[in-house]
Amino acid sequence: MTNICIIATIIIYLVAMLLVGFAYSKSNNDSTDFYLGGRKMGPLVTAMSAEASDMSSWLLMGMPGLAYLTGIASPGWTAIGLALGTWLNWLIVARRLRRYSANLEAITVPQFLSLRFHDQRNLLNALGAVIIIVFFVPYTASGFAACGKLFHSLFGVDYMAAMVVSACVIVGYTITGGFRAVTTTDLIQSIVMSLALVAVLVYGIGAAGGWDAVVANAQSLPGYLTMLASHNAAEGTATSYSLLDIVSTMAWGLGYFGMPHILLRFMAIEDEKKLVLSRRIASVWVVIAMTASIIIGMVGLGMTKAGALEYLSGSSSETVIVRIANLIAQHGILAAVLAGLILAGILAATMSTADSQMLAAASSVSQNILQEFGHMKLTERQSLFAARLTIICVSVVGVVLARDPNSSVFGIVSFAWAGFGGAYGAVMLCALFWKRCNWQGALAGMLVGGLMVFVWKYLVSPLGGVFGIYELLPAFLISLLVCVVVSLVTPAPSKEIEAEFEAAK
């Protein structure tokens, strides 16, 4: 009966998401409607959609799992960097990008860069689209992996089968409803995610013997409850957390300036004046959600100490919320329904990011590669068909990449996040705030930044020491340097480009 209630709750939730997609299916009259919702998004939907699409499955799986194993330092500094990055992105990028993109009538991030620099060859369009596809596919795969882990660990359902079903639901409402469906479901999913965090915290603290017991257990573990050390569970010792480690984890915040699926939310709000309210909502929610996520990891370890939860090692630590939900479900029908909502919250975290990523990838192929770079003359209907076909292809490749049940959600997200921050972050800031920047500098910055993520991750980082820093930081800085240097040694932008820049201030 317990499993039936949980499964029924999850099915109802998934069907509701599909119905949202179908409800908006007839409102997509053109590409602007499908990709940006006609630039008619309200402040609440804009804020919560941006943050729900940002906080993927790592919020309810990766971050609690990291806190469970290593303590609060690594997830804590990461959360601080992300909170600062979120706030700065809303503060300095959102308004300028909304105004500039509307002036240029750009509906995708690569298209904005191409129009911003009057890139006649559409090289920025093509490179930007390729970068989005290269890094969004593994990012999407991490979401599918989270879905597979969820159902496999709870019901013993085949990992691959769970991924395929989850992918079909996400693809279903994304290809039918477009941006409006994605943002509306994101709002719903952010609420479900919040309820899941609260429910798990309340139950977990009680099962661990109370808050004092949770804290006492954390204090007894070397390096667990300090921001200057990391707990080594295997050896029962503390590892010093250096300044390099702090800078490396906080560097996550730089990624926000280059996240296409988040930047699209800024471009879609109905009135730039409402961005202030959106910023406040988004910033507060992010801080609360990440704090709760880290505490859940600590509470989960407290439950292990109390004998309420088995010890979770390696990537299985990412299922701590799933295990707690399973314990909640054993307390009756209503508790099982609540457990179903908690698990739906994990699905929500995954779906709210995956749908946005697939939509961004779809716009890159249909709008940026086929029409603008490839000069294909597509009708609105053909363009939307190409976009929907891209969504299906991305999901198929994502499922294939995530076929390993032992893959780390946090690890996959970390690399993809670095890719976007390194390739897009510095270039986007230069495009918005530096008038002397030109298309040559932007192109070089994107190319070098994207490549540097791979070079640093696989060639430089293994050297250890100072080179072990998170690849996003060196990629971002080198991209910025290359963008500035190349712009300065090549011809200055035309008077027309400078006039457009001034008009967007």
Which role fits each region the language model picked out?
Residues 1-505:
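Membrane-embedded helix-loop-helix hairpins and adjacent transmembrane boundary segments
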